[in-house]
Amino acid sequence: MVTDWKKDFGLPSDILKGGLLMSGMYDLKPVRLSKRSEYVKFTDEMEQALSTQRHLDKLNAPIIVSYGTLESPEFQRQARDFVAAVKAAGKPVQLIVGEGYNHFEMPETFGNPYGLMGRAALEQMKLAPAQPQS
């Protein structure tokens, strides 16, 4: 979402029209401060380059950020903090919280046009089907 498509690949800078970000790590500093730093050998440069939250000036498409309420507190915090930072940068962002979903169940909702993320993806593309009648 923060790639310079024109410079790096010769593609239109607005080639991506939107994105759905799920259960992500948007600032990698906490990883380096955790026990994981023993096996995840990030350098300062890698941390900077891979921390999306530090490149919001390059974000040029609306995004949807999501997480499930049964995910780890760190995934939830990262999503909330990232959404707040995107809003503060004046960029379009929406937060979707999957009540009762864990890290592995959230992606499963993409496969159904009425599922939490499937519907969000279709709505973002302006292709959402009508809600089923009860």
Question: Where do the model's predicted regions map?
Answer:
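Short, conserved loop/helix-junction motifs that constitute active-site signature segments
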Residues: 12-14, 56-59
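Short beta-strand/loop motif that positions the catalytic acidic residue
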Residues: 59-60, 65-68
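Loop/turn elements at helix/coil->beta-strand transitions in domains of secreted/extracellular proteins
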Residues: 15-18, 61-62, 91
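Lipolytic serine-hydrolase domain surface
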Residues: 53, 68-71
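Primarily recognizes the serine-hydrolase "nucleophile elbow" in alpha/beta-hydrolase
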Residues: 1-37, 47-48
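C-terminal catalytic histidine-bearing segment of alpha/beta-hydrolase fold enzymes
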Residues: 66, 73-83, 87-134
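A general structural signal for stabilizing positions within well-ordered secondary structure
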Residues: 10, 54-55, 87
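Alpha-helical scaffolding within the catalytic cores
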Residues: 41-54
